């Protein structure tokens, strides 16, 4: 276990990689194979986004921890090191135009999955919606804005 990973467990958070695995598995359960594939594309895109942009959504201290973790294992640092509380701050940017998937149906799935992900995180108390209200509201607003853009 790396130094940074040890810090995560001290913070008592479930790593983003486990959060996303559980959420996307639950979301795909019983769905049509085409929908499961679409959800897989959204998950892969979210993981790519977190690798590319995740640092810009966290504090300087957390960014320094991510840089340290990448010295040990370059790929997947955000998912290994951080928890749901940091993920919720990254989600609004994932719904911004540069990060929306090009395929119409994939894009709608991306918007819907992220909107439901925030609710899922709050309902399972992985994110305190009162403490992180701003990030939760920003994600919901970003989802609504992206949904309007996608359907008009």
Label the model's feature ranges.
Residues 18-29, 41:
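Intrinsically disordered, low-complexity, repeat-rich regions
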Residues 24-28, 54, 95, 99, ...:
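Generic secondary-structure transition motif, activating predominantly at the C-termini of alpha-helices
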Residues 32-123:
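Non-catalytic DNA-binding core/recognition domains of DNA-processing enzymes
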Residues 10-20:
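N-terminal DNA-binding module of tyrosine recombinases/phage integrases
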Residues 1-10:
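Short, Lys/Arg-enriched N-terminal segments with co-localized hydrophobic residues
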Residues 21, 38, 131-134:
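Charge-rich alpha-helical segments
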Residues 57-68, 123-152:
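Short, charged hinge/linker segments at domain and secondary-structure junctions
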């Amino acid at each position: 276990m790396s130094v940074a990973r040890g810090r995560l467990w001290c913070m008592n958070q479930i790593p983003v990689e486990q959060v996303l695995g559980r959420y996307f598995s639950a979301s795909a359960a019983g769905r049509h194979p085409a929908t499961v594939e679409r959800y897989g594309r959204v998950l892969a895109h979210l993981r790519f986004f977190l690798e590319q942009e995740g640092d810009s959504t966290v504090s300087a201290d957390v960014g320094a921890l991510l840089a340290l973790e990448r010295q040990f294992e370059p790929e997947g640092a955000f998912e290994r090191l951080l928890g749901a509380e940091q993920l919720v701050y990254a989600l609004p940017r994932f719904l911004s135009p540069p990060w929306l998937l090009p395929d119409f149906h994939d894009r709608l799935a991306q918007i819907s999955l992220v909107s439901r992900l925030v609710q899922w995180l709050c309902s399972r108390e992985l994110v305190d919606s009162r403490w992180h209200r701003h990030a939760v509201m920003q994600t919901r607003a970003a989802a609504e804005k992206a949904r309007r853009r996608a359907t008009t």
